[in-house]
Amino acid sequence: TVDSLRKVGYEGDYIVMPNGCDLPKLDCTEEMKAMIRRKHGIPEGIPILLFVGRMMWYKNLRIILDACRLLKESGREYRMIIIGMGPEENAIKKYAAKLNIGDKVIFTGQILDRQELQIYYGTADMLVFPSTFDTNGLVVREAAASATPAIVVANSCASEGITDCETGFLCLESSRSVAKVIDRIADNKDLLHRVGQNARNNIYISWDESIATAYNRYQTVIDKFNSTFHNKYKY
């Protein structure tokens, strides 16, 4: 966020106000996770990767699909679940078919039921979100509500608050980098659990907390204004 402001020429002071998340903190039960695996025919033990967002190329879905191809070619077992819809959905599906990864990638379409969506978050081993377009990676915080860590591009807005291997995982904006990170962490359940818990404790914020933070900041601005000579003017 700060880098985006600097790029357009803003050099003043700033305070970043975090977006809140409407999903509560939730630990999915083993039965919830088994339900998702049964629904999509995913055997127990195979790592589940997740993307949630609009089906648009600017979300770097090409990087995700190319990474899936690299993982398949290397012999890595996994399933990538892609949740969302959008005007480029058909083109994205055709590209996945062209890469011959239809046995590894599952397109669910849009999921409007927020409780169902949260079960997907909680079932996944990791969220894969290499978008550099988003000014705030809300899905990263949604995943954190279920203690699911995210892979994000270093120095992107989505990476704000992410420390590599502590509250998430950082990659370069390339399919090879994404594939390399996935392959390195997919079987390390202890690492995924620890980083997921850290994400929940450090980057998750509820809307109530976000509103309280914004309210306090506005109050500070109002108090500062009232303490200046401007308060002598009556409007």
Q: What residues fall within each predicted segment?
A:
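Carbohydrate-associated surface elements
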Residues: 20
